[in-house]
């Protein structure tokens, strides 16, 4: 993980990081992951270790502050809005996606108070030159309230003819990756196409870098726990199986044997690498962050335990639904992984 240590905030007051009206909204309504995101432009100076608020349209970084209400657990009362460490979650899976070979913008986390803010580099602005991009939902011609309701045939009709074979394969790989990690908040506004150049005469569209990647599987009943938010199967379903992903490949003109190999390769890599390369490499401070249970006595686990429990559950689901062959000795419990 890329943790910015020793950085100071310049011209960024607390009310900009944590707007009172946003905290009030989070406190009063259960709006899931999509409604949590808030960001503003910053300048990132690595030499001075400064994060500075800016209204310069050419600055190339955004900061997404954590929401105080989302990481506050109430010992008594309603915790429907308890979605802690979302930005650590996002940074972790953005890093994994990058390592899997996907085009991912630079991103990092920086501590402030009880949680971490998230910084990401814009992919549509290079040295002040803007590259126009359009999300899939806009191509389809629907409003934001329909971002989870898009049918696969709509993608096929309005988007797939606009991209080349290489990008189509990358998109399929990303859909498989998203199912494997449980990216339940993937929707039609989280995927976009960008023009290859900034020329007024440019007509070629390419798949944009991927962004807003996180697992919803660690938040229990407080968020939609589907394997993937985008409706790419023949019907809405919580768990995607191997047959679903092979059917999607066929609809994207991707060879069945290639699709089979992608499913197996990505699933096994995720299962083999998640603990060693992503959980174990977190700082002890992050691993020991308290993560409260929503059921039972509402005791707190650590973030490390929650992530390992998630891995154990994903291993079972991947074996059951994606029919990936997993060696018996690799089927470890959370406790076994914790004390390795």
Where are these regions (language model features)?
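Phosphate/dinucleotide-binding and metal-coordinating scaffold of catalytic cores
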Residues: 1-340
């Amino acid at each position: 993980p890329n943790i910015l240590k020793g950085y100071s905030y310049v011209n960024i007051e607390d009310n900009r990081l944590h707007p009172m009206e946003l905290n009030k909204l989070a406190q009063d309504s259960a709006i899931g992951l999509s409604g949590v995101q808030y960001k503003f432009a910053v300048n990132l100076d690595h030499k001075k270790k400064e994060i500075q608020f800016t209204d310069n349209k050419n600055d190339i970084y955004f900061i997404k502050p954590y929401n105080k209400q989302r990481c506050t657990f109430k010992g008594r009362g309603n915790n429907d809005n308890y979605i802690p460490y979302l930005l650590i979650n996002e940074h972790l899976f953005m890093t994994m996606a990058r390592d899997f070979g996907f085009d991912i913008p630079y991103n990092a986390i920086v501590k402030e108070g009880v949680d971490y803010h998230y910084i990401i580099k814009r992919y549509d602005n290079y040295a002040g030159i803007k590259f126009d991009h359009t999300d899939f939902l806009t191509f389809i011609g629907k409003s934001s309230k329909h971002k989870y309701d898009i049918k696969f045939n709509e993608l096929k009709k309005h988007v797939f003819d606009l991209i080349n074979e290489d990008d189509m394969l990358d998109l399929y790989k990303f859909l498989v990756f998203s199912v494997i990690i449980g990216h339940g908040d993937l929707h039609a506004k989280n995927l976009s196409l960008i023009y290859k150049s900034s020329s007024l005469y440019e007509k070629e569209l390419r798949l944009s870098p991927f962004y807003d990647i996180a697992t919803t599987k660690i938040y229990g009943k407080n968020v939609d726990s589907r394997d993937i938010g985008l409706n790419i199967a023949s019907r809405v379903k919580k768990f995607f199986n191997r047959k679903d992903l092979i059917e999607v490949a066929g609809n994207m003109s991707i060879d069945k044997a290639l699709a089979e190999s992608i499913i197996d390769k990505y699933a096994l890599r995720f299962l083999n690498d998640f603990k060693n390369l992503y959980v174990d490499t977190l700082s002890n401070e992050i691993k020991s962050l308290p993560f409260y249970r929503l059921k039972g006595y509402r005791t707190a686990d650590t973030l490390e335990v929650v992530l390992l429990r998630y891995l154990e559950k994903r291993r079972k689901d991947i074996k059951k639904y994606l029919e990936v062959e997993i060696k018996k000795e690799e089927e470890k419990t959370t406790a076994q992984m914790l004390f390795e």
